Amino acid sequence: MGVVPGNAPVALQNHLSNGQQLLVPKKMFFTKGVGSHKHELRSFELALRDAGIEKCNIVHVSSIFPPNCELISKNEGMKYIYPGMITFAVTARTTSNEARRLMAASIGCAIPSDSNKYGYLSEYYAFGQTEKEAGDTAEDLAAAMLASTLGIDIDEDKSWDEKEEIFRISDEIVKTTNVTQSAMVEKGGYTTVVAAGVFIF
């Protein structure tokens, strides 16, 4: 076992010193998908297939981007996926069989400039919103949650563009982003949209 870093949190030092391991993801990637079928379950499976994670046993978790976690591309992340593996992911999903109804699912992400601090992920889903509208909302939610932990004073009623400028000036938040899947429900069945941030250990 390696030397425990002196600046590691006390809880982490205690666990490592006792020979225990904390389940903290080292990497994360974003993915999204959409599926349509006459059966709701099959539409969900097809959405997962479109996202490339249908072979995983997915465990839904919330909503912290771990310290020193690396955000990687989907192509890179898929190299770590193995059929049947227990896969922890922050997921957003919505389903409908109301023909021509617009819907979206989104994961927002806000990462602090100090990599030793944690960031936030938000799950958001909505009807009647475009991909951009849902994505901006999810990103806004994640950034607002992170800002509140960093002591950045913001007006929640400001537009996302105004808040984004405040975050940029504060120099505390290095990156905000989102992954969003929108779709119009197909006639004669169910349509499901899925967005996910998938953790790799």
Predicted regions and their residues:
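Helix-coil modules at protein/domain termini and other flexible surface or pore-lining loops
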Residues: 2-201
